[in-house]
Amino acid sequence: MSQNPPLLRPDLARARVPDDARPGQPRIGMVSLGCPKALVDSERILTRLRAEGYAISPDYTGAEAVIVNTCGFLDSAKLESLEAIGEALEANGKVIVTGCLGAEPEYITGAHPTVLAVTGPQQYEQVLDAVHGAVPPAPDPFIDLLPPAGVKLTPRHYAYLKIAEGCDHKCKFCIIPDMRGKLVSRPQTAVMREAEKLVDSGVKELLIISQDTSAYGVDWKDRNKAGDEKFPILNLSRDLSTLGAWVRLHYVYPYPHVRELIPLMADPANGLLPYLDIPFQHAHPDVLKRMARPAAASRTLDEIAAWRRDCPNITLRSTFIVGYPGETEAEFQTLLDWLDEAQLDRIGCFQYENVDGARSNALPDHVAPEVKQDRWDRFMEKAQAISEAKLQAKVGRTMQVLVDSVDEEGATCRTVADAPEIDGNLFIDEGFDGLTPGDLVTVEVDEASEYDLWGKLT
């Protein structure tokens, strides 16, 4: 990990947590691993701790105990979590484990029997109880004032906003429903209240996340069956779009009702960005069937065409798995051909690997490692070519960008087509004096590479 647990993983957050403890105030450290959804869990825990009088330590040695929020999605992530726990134990000695890997307490205590407690994902109260047992709180209501938006581990100008927990799908390669349970959507009033506090605190971009964002609210038993209330994500998106910030949707399944979001994205007068992050995973129907995925590749091409017809500037991001058990060369070639036709804007790819507890482990005809690597290389070569062509087409255009960071070499920015950390950047290397993170500025694009753009202020 790092010597500074609150910095988290560099691919998720770069904001430094200040050491602002008063004399005698108990201090807790936090190490957060995994996806943005786990990051939001860490933020909630830290917010609760601050409300109860704890300070957040910027290092192991200054903390009286350390919380490690783990990831258990892949075997490699489990090993990383065990290493982070071991590092925290060696550096501090008092460690509380939570998160997805906490659903397997014996796995953790077998490797690290001296941890103080192990709790599962979203078990905030249990985490707080463990902290109380290790380090009693010392609240001072006249001093311990929280910022209205809570404690955030991302830069101040953007924030992840989790709208639901759990997932009702049963994809064979995924164990998240086993760890996080069935879909449980947050009340829209609670989501909007948090969103308003974030925007009021200076957040310029809200990144909407859950396991299945487009299914938001379908678990509500008393919802109406007509209009926006049939699919509450439509009403929520409409309300979020009025707050004056960029609103970016992640983890969206290509359900038919998603098409109803597109006119809202096409309207430049509101904040819902023309951007969809959709995990298609594959394109061959037989592979999708073996994955138990709730989508068909032929229909998704029709949906993509409809989205682009109604919103020509929409950005489509997706991730795929190559080397899934039973994947033949012909099935993989179908995926490559599908990419040629779909022409997605942002494309990621993973090589399949077994995950303890996943049903896909028992499938026949696992693909050899060297074949998976070859297919990944060929996939990424095509994805890179598509990306480069799309970015070259943007040279000469004028667009609004959000400034993420500024140093002596220039400003690193993002367009509406770029989510933080996972997509590309737009760099300004001239005339950037006076820019600060969170600024929204207009640039003219004058250069492009495979994944990034360069531009100048207009």
Curated annotation (Swiss-Prot):
Catalysis performed (reactions): L-aspartate(89)-[ribosomal protein uS12]-hydrogen + (sulfur carrier)-SH + AH2 + 2 S-adenosyl-L-methionine = 3-methylsulfanyl-L-aspartate(89)-[ribosomal protein uS12]-hydrogen + (sulfur carrier)-H + 5'-deoxyadenosine + L-methionine + A + S-adenosyl-L-homocysteine + 2 H(+)
Domain MTTase N-terminal: 26-136
PROSITE patterns linked to this entry: MTTASE_N, RADICAL_SAM, TRAM
Sequence ranges assigned to domain TRAM in this UniProt record: 392-458
Positions that bind [4Fe-4S] cluster 2: C167, C171, C174
Entry GO CC: cytosol
EC number: 2.8.4.4
Ranges of residues in domain Radical SAM core: 153-389
Cofactors demanded by this protein: [4Fe-4S] cluster
Annotated S-S bridges: none
Cofactor binding comment, as recorded: Binds 2 [4Fe-4S] clusters. One cluster is coordinated with 3 cysteines and an exchangeable S-adenosyl-L-methionine.
Top-rank lineage group of the source organism: Bacteria
Any one GO BP annotation for this protein: tRNA modification
Main location: cytoplasm
Compartments where located: Cytoplasm
Pfam family name, one: Radical_SAM
GO MF, one example: 4 iron, 4 sulfur cluster binding
Family affiliation: Belongs to the methylthiotransferase family. RimO subfamily.
Function in brief: Catalyzes the methylthiolation of an aspartic acid residue of ribosomal protein uS12.
UniProt-listed HAMAP family: MTTase_RimO
Protein name from the UniProt record: Ribosomal protein uS12 methylthiotransferase RimO
Naturally occurring in which organism (per UniProt): Jannaschia sp. (strain CCS1)
